[in-house]
């Protein structure tokens, strides 16, 4: 790289905030990251991409767990013969030989798998059962039975497949699923401890058949699953991703949100595409599965979520936080509770999460630790005291589970449980109950004893069926479990294989020691030690910080634009117009130097705002999350004739006549329009905009206030978001100012995990601030790698060229097959400003504009301001109107500051030298080549740069690639 020691200050240089640049070296947990003036070196790029893939895979493991869990359920059921016409029923209850997440031992489980690929299915349900249907992604479809629309009377349910459009017959409870595969769960109830009556009733009345066979429905078969050893628990190794891929391939894209599909697509899991990770990616997925698995265990067994703890001074937790089966609170997805739920349980229903009236439904409390905060040890003996008047109208139960598999603990007892139905249960005189856990029963306590196994950790769940008010008002609370120190522990060596033991697949358990990119992780029979918990939570916070930056960069970018505009004057009253064009003194993401820009900030908090658009301009309005709202001008509904646009704020009711009406999802909007030069002169465009552009509140339409036009040309101001910790403060302002539903729950949930949540102060402690500061730099570095050294093959115009696109995928929402193209979004918003379909879609030849970017020379090396280069544009440059070449600073992505006012050349430039064959050679370097000054753009020694070639009115030879720009060649 060139030396910066001899560089003098360019004439156009302005003060650049350090917060928008990145140092030449940043020390991080990934190792030292090195840059040449904002351009990452090869080793840095490798580290950043390895980290990006690893962290995305960890995030995918935690996010896609419901899909993997339901896929494992399907495979387990199909292994014992379950199909559309055959269901499994546990006639003598479910015992510990079946690997099933935290099932109870008091219900008659009937489970099936509904395949809707051939059309709708009818499910005729028995009376007095409690059931549900969930889709392949763990989303609730409907409740059945006592909590369903049949209210426990039995009924006919019609389940429709995705996109079903045929006539729906009458006489059914109709529900639509977003997936073809659906899990059916029905639970019957014992009568005086006997399951037989419920089994007979279910077998006599449960029917599943295609709606097309309503006249003569086929017989429904039943497989007795009691005592059967089969697995329904998802894998936790790299095969997890293969499992999720099968779900993605089989199900429609509408089944899950675009962000989740985009996350999976970034790992190679994309609908219609083969999942074939190479050796590097396979190793990354293996490490990510291990860390994701470890993180899920930390979330489940040592939760940081205070609301999960049912009582202030005890160790009981609830799986559902916020009272929502969708894990939503004020529009925010609760990410950790969702992971904890699907890691330890199956079945998602509002009846499980909502606060039902007293004595209705059931309530759950799970404990992983004794009163000292120590994990339960299968070789030790414990006592649980349930105080008098246990608040269960129907009955209560306690079931013990294995910390490795989260299924019932396998012991010599068929059922590792106790309930109030248990014959011989000892009840104290005051109606309290003492329950004992240990490898051997205490003398006289066997009736109240649940066996544990030395060398095995365990946890238990207390269930209250028909919970009473004293549970909800917390006047009744179970005691914490206490170890009985007087009882001698039993060592694992003395233990024998339990009578009910079953082989757990290695893919569902975790080793005692794992080497990972975040260090050595240690476990004791599935329980992470303190050091491991600290490591996975630090990594989780760090990766969420990085992902938050990459995901919310559009919002931070708009925030910076607002601050820049407001430095000239208030919103709704001020237009920044570049009367002498936009030069390099203004810090603005990749503007051109051939248009008259006019910018304004629109604030809808006090009501609708009108924009009267000038004729013959090209404008766009984007919201505060940088999403497209409207085209204004030539690409808008006024077709360049000028028009009155009315922008309505969120929740606004009533639409007045006489306007082109647009609905906004945010109160803050950014408006940008461009006028066009006439024979190289900006004056006509400036006069046109000043004469016709009006912005005013609808309430003042009868007497609009005067609009202030501020000349931005030659002014030094910043519209570029921060790259350090202050990035998070910028995004927090957006979250606080805008409605809670302005952005999707997943994004809000991601931000909430790092402390950014509407209505709450963003006040990270010292630990979190340090993590986020590092995450901000790593995210900024990652955005630079994605932009300057992109891996997206479709970003390049051809495999042998450095020229690439700013919009990848041809969609302004960065969508492909329902999946968000995460890297494409990052590339655009790190590098450019202004979202509109007009920039992304292919227009007819001769219409609109096209862009080509280059960040490296013909040898793949970063463009160095101390060296000399040449760009050859072959004959017949395909631009009906004109073309231009503009240089930008790698640090700021704004115009390169040199001695030249405009770091650009265009076909409109007076004196441009055109070769005899109509080709053009353009030169770049710190000094003009002899005889080529008219075709020279200056660069600065020690500064990196990049270039955009713009074609206005692009012709067909551009689209069919019979014309291509030359590569940038180093000369001299």
PLM regions with names:
Residues 2-972:
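A compositional/structural signature for long, glycine/proline-rich flexible linkers
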């Amino acid at each position: 790289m060139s030396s910066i020691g001899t560089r003098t200050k360019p004439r156009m240089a302005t003060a650049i905030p350090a917060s928008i640049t990145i140092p030449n070296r940043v020390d991080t947990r990934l190792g030292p990251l090195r840059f040449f003036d904002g351009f990452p070196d090869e080793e840095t790029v490798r580290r950043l991409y390895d980290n990006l893939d690893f962290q995305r895979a960890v995030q995918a493991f935690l996010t896609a767990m419901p899909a993997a869990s339901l896929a494992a359920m399907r495979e387990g059921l199909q292994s014992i013969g379950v199909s559309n016409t055959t269901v499994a029923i546990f006639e003598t209850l479910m015992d510990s030989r079946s690997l099933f997440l935290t099932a109870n031992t008091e219900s008659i489980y009937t489970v099936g798998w509904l395949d809707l690929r051939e059309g709708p299915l009818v499910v005729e349900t028995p009376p007095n059962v409690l059931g549900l249907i969930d889709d392949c992604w763990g989303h609730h479809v409907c409740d059945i039975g006592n909590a369903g629309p049949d209210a426990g009377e039995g009924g006919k349910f019609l389940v429709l497949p995705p996109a079903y459009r045929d006539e729906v017959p009458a006489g059914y409870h109709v529900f639509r699923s977003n997936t073809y595969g659906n899990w059916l769960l029905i639970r019957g109830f014992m009568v005086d401890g006997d399951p037989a009556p419920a089994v007979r009733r279910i077998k006599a009345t449960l029917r599943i058949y295609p709606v097309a066979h309503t006249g003569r429905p086929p017989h429904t078969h039943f497989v007795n699953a009691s005592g059967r050893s089969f697995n329904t628990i998802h894998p936790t190794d790299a095969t997890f991703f293969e499992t999720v891929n099968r779900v993605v391939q089989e199900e429609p894209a509408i089944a899950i949100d675009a962000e989740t599909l985009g996350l999976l697509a970034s790992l190679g899991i994309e609908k219609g595409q083969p999942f074939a990770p190479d050796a590097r990616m396979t190793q990354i997925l293996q490490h990510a599965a291990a860390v994701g698995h470890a993180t899920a265990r930390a979330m489940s067994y040592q939760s940081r979520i205070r609301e999960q703890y049912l009582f202030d001074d005890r160790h009981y937790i609830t799986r559902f936080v916020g009272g929502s089966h969708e894990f939503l609170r004020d529009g925010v997805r609760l990410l950790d509770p969702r992971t904890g739920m699907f890691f330890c349980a199956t079945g998602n229903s509002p009846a499980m999460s909502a606060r039902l009236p007293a004595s209705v439904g059931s309530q759950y409390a799970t404990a992983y630790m004794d009163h000292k905060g120590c994990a339960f040890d299968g070789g030790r003996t414990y006592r649980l005291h349930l105080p008098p008047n246990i608040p269960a109208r129907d009955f209560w139960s306690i079931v013990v589970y294995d910390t490795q598999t989260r299924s019932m603990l396998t012991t010599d007892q068929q059922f590792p449980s106790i309930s109030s139905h248990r014959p011989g249960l000892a009840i104290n005189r005051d109606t309290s109950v003492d329950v004992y856990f240990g490898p051997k029963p205490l003398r006289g306590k066997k009736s109240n004893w649940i066996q544990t196994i030395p060398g095995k950790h365990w946890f238990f769940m207390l269930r209250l069926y028909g919970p009473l008010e004293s549970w909800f008002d917390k006047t009744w609370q179970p005691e914490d479990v206490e170890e009985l120190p007087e009882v001698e522990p039993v060592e694992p060596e003395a233990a024998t294989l339990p009578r009910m033991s079953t082989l757990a697949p290695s893919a569902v358990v975790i080793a005692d020691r794992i080497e990972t990119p975040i260090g050595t992780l240690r476990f004791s029979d599935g329980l992470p030690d303190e050091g491991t918990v600290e490591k996975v939570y630090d990594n989780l916070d760090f990766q969420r910080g990085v992902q938050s930056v990459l995901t919310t960069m559009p919002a931070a970018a708009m925030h910076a634009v607002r601050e820049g505009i407001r430095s000239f004057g208030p919103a709704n009253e001020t237009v920044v117009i570049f009367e002498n064009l936009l030069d390099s003194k203004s810090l603005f993401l990749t503007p051109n130097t051939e248009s008259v820009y006019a910018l304004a900030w629109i604030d809808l908090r006090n009501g609708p705002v009108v924009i009267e658009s000038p004729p013959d301009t090209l404008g766009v309005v984007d919201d505060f999350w940088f999403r497209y709202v409207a085209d204004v001008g030539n690409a808008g509904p006024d077709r360049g004739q000028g028009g009155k646009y009315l922008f309505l704020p969120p929740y606004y009711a009533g639409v007045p006549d006489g306007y082109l009406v647009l609905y906004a999802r945010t109160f803050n909007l950014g408006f940008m329009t461009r006028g066009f030069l006439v024979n190289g002169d900006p004056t006509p465009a400036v006069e046109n905009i000043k004469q016709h552009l009006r912005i005013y509140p609808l309430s003042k339409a009868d007497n609009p206030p005067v609009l202030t036009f501020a000349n931005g040309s030659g002014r030094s101001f910043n519209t570029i978001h921060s790259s350090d910790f202050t990035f998070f403060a910028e995004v927090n302002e957006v979250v606080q100012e805008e409605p809670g539903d302005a952005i999707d729950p997943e994004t809000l949930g991601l931000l909430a995990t790092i402390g950014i949540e509407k209505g709450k102060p963003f006040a990270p402690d010292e630990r979190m601030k340090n993590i986020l500061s590092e995450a901000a730099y790593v995210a900024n570095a990652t955005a630079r790698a994605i932009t300057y050294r992109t891996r997206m093959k479709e970003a390049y115009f051809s495999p042998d060229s450095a020229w690439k696109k700013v919009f990848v995928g041809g969609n302004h929402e960065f969508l492909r097959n329902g999946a968000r193209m995460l890297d494409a979004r990052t590339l655009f918003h790190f590098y450019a400003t202004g979202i509109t379909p007009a920039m992304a879609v292919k227009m007819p030849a001769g219409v609109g504009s096209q862009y080509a970017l280059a960040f490296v020379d013909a040898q793949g090396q970063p463009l160095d301001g101390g060296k000399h280069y040449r760009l050859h544009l072959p004959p017949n440059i395909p631009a009906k109107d004109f073309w231009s070449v503009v240089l930008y600073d790698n640090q700021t992505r704004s115009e390169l500051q040199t001695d030249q006012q405009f770091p650009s050349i265009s076909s409109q430039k007076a004196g441009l030298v055109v070769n005899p064959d109509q080709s053009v050679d353009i030169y770049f370097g710190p000094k003009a080549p002899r005889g080529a000054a008219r075709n020279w753009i200056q660069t600065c020694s020690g500064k990196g740069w990049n270039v955009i070639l713009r074609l206005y009115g692009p012709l067909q030879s551009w689209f069919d690639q019979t014309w291509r720009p030359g590569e940038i060649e180093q000369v001299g």
